[in-house]
Amino acid sequence: MAVAPARARSDYDYLIKLLLIGDSGVGKSCLLLRFSDDTFTTSFITTIGIDFKIRTVELDGKRIKLQIWDTAGQERFRTITTAYYRGAMGILLVYDVTDESSFNNIRNWMKNIEQHASDNVNKILVGNKADMDESKRAVPTAKGQALADEYGIKFFETSAKTNLNVENVFMSIAKDIKQRLTETDTKAEPQGIKITKQDTAASSSTAEKSACCSYV
């Protein structure tokens, strides 16, 4: 029998883990910071590890807590493994529209996802740095759309600098995940998406431990 979600600490109904995947330098951290804090900086100091930000949004009358994870430099060493993908409900595959190699590597990231992520994870393709001058563009919009169509996923071009489509891309994948959750039966519940009263104490403990994480 399905258990109705209970708000942990009365501040959200669902917890959704999202991942940002892509080559180093495509702007994943900038997208994360723009969406979570509505700020932008070009002076990031890359750290080695995994970091995340949280933002709570409302969809269809439900408060959705988005936990968005950034690789924080690990992608340079190809060390992203199953542990990073565990529990992920959505993945944003990001490339730089001025860097064709980052676009070509999307196929490799897709293979990585197929190896480590759950079969039903939602995916979305993101062409970042769309604010750059057209003379610097290496990947036409049509080419990005064609790749997304090939994989059967949505496609957005974004700019963390100008805030172009940043809100739209995160809200789009969150909405798709929520819709999928409402269509699933009780078999989906062990994945830890619905927050029950029993989870509240554990969530509080985890939050305390996560407080030491810093964002760069």
Swiss-Prot record:
Its biological function?
Answer: Involved in membrane trafficking from the Golgi to the plasma membrane.
Entry protein name: Ras-related protein RABE1d
Q: Where in the cell is it found?
A: Golgi apparatus membrane; Cell membrane
Origin superkingdom: Eukaryota
The record places the motif (Effector region) at: 44-52
Lipid attachment site numbers (S-geranylgeranyl cysteine):
C212, C213
Q: Give the bilayer topology.
A: Lipid-anchor
Please cite one Gene Ontology biological process associated with this protein.
protein transport
| Keyword Cell membrane (UniProt) | yes
